[in-house]
Amino acid sequence: MTRWLLLLIPILFLTLDGSAQGSLSIAGTVKDIKGEPLPGAGIYLSGYKIATVSDNTGKFTLPGLKPGSYDVLVQMIGFLPYTKNVILSDKSISIEIIVKESVTQLKEVVINIDPNRQFYINRFKDQFIGKTPNSEKCKILNPEVLITEYDKERRILRVTADEFLIVENQALGYRIKYLLKYFESNFESNIIFFSGLPHFEELKGSKSKKRKWLQNREIAYAGSSQHFFKSLYSNSTKEEGFIIYKLREVENKNRLADKLIDYKIKLFTSQSRNAFLTDPSNDSLIYWQRKKNEPKTLEVLNRTEVQTDTLVKTIYKDLKTINYQDALYIMFTKERESKQYTTMSGHAVGRPPDIPNYQISVVHMINAPANFYEYGAVLDPRSLLYSGFWGYEKVADMVPMDYTPLQKSE
């Protein structure tokens, strides 16, 4: 079964935990291009439940923040969404936000032209929301804002949006406003990449629903990449249930050269064209076709546990970094992979027969180094490539950065 890879969901979580109150703030004024203040604009922090509204003079304040890198999102009816990255160090910051009016008529015409649009939207939903059990209770409320483009020659689907995508997650109890910057699904390389800025809102529900949502959130957080990097920052991966190995790619020395294989395939194809099925040349052709399908490289698992103090370095007070050559093979021992995931998802990675069906993710370093914050936020969206369980989990299994797991008694 084809295995899909996920380039680290980017710009999802670029900030620190809003639940751990700090003394800094981001303040500012929202104006139109004429300089007139805009009251009633929604101001959000990407990856959080933190939000406010501009007052009658267009002013706003987002208080209680810690040092870190924040993405401010602004939404106002009749205007295009606005984003601005703000870095807080040792003092609060004031910013001016200028938003532009939205023009939608042309986009509506373009949407109606493409006869394959619904097919592309369905593909996008599967690869953006995901195909986990939680995805069955997720719904995109405004798919009409999506703009699709398919490159037939390169077999790449691209999706963007000029407005917030609204995702209702009835599995976790969140309404997500997602400003989709970019989505690309490459059907040649099997790599999915998407970047965007989400804001989380709590859904209303009964007490029983909220209890169920809390249970599901605990499951979604446990073993996630956010959980891993948070524990990696605090040097507590072992206690949190993670085991880290290294996975190395080596040349498959038993594989014959492509030049020889291609020659043999051409030779026996020619001989078998007018032959009966029992002709020996058919068996030879099958043999060489199998040789063609043999992998050029093999994966070798080094089962010496990686010590986090050798993997992680501190570069700034609130920022740490990792840089490595071979892929990280990360096992989460407190949850198991389901049979459906292992056999049907197309994301499962190989494991030695003596390793239980722990949740396994493989993390490749694409653009070194990878910097990350205390609460699981990876700074550079294109630094890491996920396969395995983290490539399987997508928007349907996201929790906000200010999510705090329950304290479990020993």
Give the positions of each predicted feature.
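Surface-exposed, low-complexity/disordered segments
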Residues: 90, 98-410
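A short, amphipathic beta-strand motif
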Residues: 24-32, 58-60, 97, 109
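Hydrophobic beta-strand segments
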Residues: 41-45, 72, 111
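Short, acidic Ser/Thr/Gly-rich low-complexity loop/linker segments typical of extracellular
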Residues: 48-59
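A short, solvent-exposed loop/turn motif at the edges and junctions
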Residues: 45, 73-84
